[in-house]
Amino acid sequence: MIDYGLKNKVALITGANNPWGIGATTAMAFAREGAKVVLVYKKVDRPFDATKTGKNGVDRYYAANAGDASDVEEKLKKMGADYLVLESDISNEDAVKEIYSTVLAKYGRVDILVNNAATDDENGFDTIEKITQKVIDDTFAVNVRGSLMMTREFINQRGDYGRIINLSTDAAQVFAGQITYGASKATLEALTRSIALEVAQYGITVNCVAPGPTQTGWIDEDFEKVVTPLIPMGKLIQPQDIAETILFLASEQARMITGQVIKVSGGKAI
């Protein structure tokens, strides 16, 4: 088994209340390696049918994101992990500062930041003919502004180790039907490259992971049949695939990798 050298490192992960999600899976992967884990999440209320949450699909996904992080916390407890759970809103500057204040008071530093939290429009208004100011503002507030402010505070509170991993999508460059979401992720990829150059002098690396269609609880059987043929490797990406990539980028072994966008898409995006 690879030793990533993450024991006792402090990893802060946003968007971590969905127990089937990338954030939660990444948190457990860090805990497995002996890292101290900070989960930050915000409840997102969207209508769902509670009778359909027992299987994969949008109802399960919406229900998970509307809840707290108790399921994830229970798993971390069983692992014997050292962890902290914070409910907050990264689109709010004061809230971001409070996140870091709380984490620094408990652990004294933050070594790794995983900007996983994101939002999108699920009402069909993220197209050029229907786009609204609210969709634009809400999407960029979390996906860009929130990630930027989390990164700023990380840099300003930096210690002697620094890894930043942003989460994008394999469709960031072209995402017809969700143009604002795609644009926000393309912006995050551009910021990854620029910030990497700015902070290289501190020995901090900044990279981005761009997942393809990932089973975080939202892909039902019908959609799986549609999307799987688009993936050359013939199967959906799993959250663990993303988490293991993040672990490597957070490790000492990846110390000379920075400013890169790593597509984990089974060949769907090259």
What kind of feature is each model-predicted range?
Residues 124-128, 132-137, 227:
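Substrate-binding pocket helix/loop in short-chain dehydrogenase/reductase
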Residues 231-242, 253:
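A conserved structural motif in NAD(P)-dependent oxidoreductases
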Residues 125, 225, 229, 233, ...:
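Short C-terminal tail/terminal secondary-structure segment
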Residues 200, 205, 257-259:
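Short, small/polar-rich loop/turn modules that mediate ligand/substrate recognition or access, typified
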Residues 4-40, 44:
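Canonical Rossmann dinucleotide-binding motif of NAD(H)/NADP(H)-dependent dehydrogenases/reductases
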Residues 63-67, 87-99, 133, 240-241:
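The beta1-alpha1 cofactor-binding region of Rossmann-like NAD(H)/NADP(H)-dependent oxidoreductases
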Residues 19-21, 119-120, 163-187, 192-201, ...:
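Catalytic loop of short-chain dehydrogenase/reductase
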